[in-house]
Amino acid sequence: MRIGYGFDLHAFGSTKPLIIGGVLIPCEKGLIAHSNGDLLIHSLIDALLGATAMGDIGSFFPSNNYIYKNIDSRILLKKIWNKIILLNYDICNIDITIIAEYPKMLPYIFFMRSNLSLDLNTEIDNISIKSTTSKKIGCIGRKEAIACHSIVMLIKNKKCI
């Protein structure tokens, strides 16, 4: 059994659409990023890479490589998951927490879970996504940024029960 942790934070300030967990969320501003800025996917990729001791998202998809400019982060997730499948790992559990003062995430969480379930070929019950605020503290509290924490548990050569 392997456990990995990932974190990402992006500031608001882009004209890009706000996409979190592969879901388009209505918002007047997007997140500043080289890719499409899907910080949930980015933190999840880092957790998967951490669990398999394969490095971090930047080592696979460097921000100075134009090929990844504005790329759909779900494509990046699928590329990483395909590498992990070759190592005979399966997902036991994914636990994700989004920290955002704005916009509210609750109406979109089911769709985020559905996207991850599809992309990672795992049961939706293996995926937990929660959201909270920073109690109006710091850059997140001032609605300048959104952060995300992800934890992944993988098992090799068999399915989790």
Swiss-Prot record:
InterPro entries: MECDP_synthase, MECDP_synthase_CS, MECDP_synthase_sf. Keywords: Isoprene biosynthesis, Lyase, Metal-binding. Its EC number is 4.6.1.12. Its cofactor is a divalent metal cation. Involved in the biosynthesis of isopentenyl diphosphate (IPP) and dimethylallyl diphosphate (DMAPP), two major building blocks of isoprenoid compounds. Catalyzes the conversion of 4-diphosphocytidyl-2-C-methyl-D-erythritol 2-phosphate (CDP-ME2P) to 2-C-methyl-D-erythritol 2,4-cyclodiphosphate (ME-CPP) with a corresponding release of cytidine 5-monophosphate (CMP). It holds the Pfam family YgbB. A divalent metal cation binds at residues 8, 10, 42. SUPFAM superfamilies: IpsF-like. This is 2-C-methyl-D-erythritol 2,4-cyclodiphosphate synthase. Belongs to the IspF family. The record marks 34, 133 as: Transition state stabilizer.
